[in-house]
Amino acid sequence: FLVQEIADALKGTDIPVFVKNPVNADLDLWIGALERLNRAGVKKLGVIHRGFSTFDKIQYRNDPQWQIAIELRSRYPELPFFVDPSHMGGSTKYIKEISQRSLDLGFEGLMIEAHCNPSSAWSDAKQQLTPAELDDLIFQQLYVRDADSDSPEWKENIDHLRAKIDVIDENLLYALGSRMKISRKIGEFKRDSNIAILQTSRWDAVLAKV
């Protein structure tokens, strides 16, 4: 998309600009669009996450790949972050679960499509709620949870559980490191023995254990 041309056109303006994610799951491309606008003097920036195109068969129209959105959020925590569950899901039946997941991850808002008569909408009819359904979703079905708590009981319990996770993570990293060393030795042994990288029977045996 022609981000630089848009950035040039917006020079000298004082309007908020929200940058949707690129079609492909490319964090640097998303950040690059934000940086171009920022260099053009656009200071009121925000982002909209609507999922990424994928060749995999998934329940949603677009793949959320939340890890990319979370990474962008961690790098630029000051940016308002909205999620578009309508386009991400591609159907009204997914709007609630995507919306709740977005709020649980701490994103600021949602961009949800609504239409007075969705069946007569010229485009994307399957993903549009009626105004009444939107009202019910926002005020009756979704929950905004606290980001943190000052409760001593909460802090004690969460610190205890996180300490357990830290120990498990250390053990996992050690085990993975040990596995990599053995894998490297196997690779060297195959090379020295003039053996192909892949033995299908071994690969099938590994998959059978999963």
What are the functions of these language-model segments?
Residues 146-210:
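Domain-level signature for soluble enzymes in the chorismate/prephenate branch of the shikimate pathway
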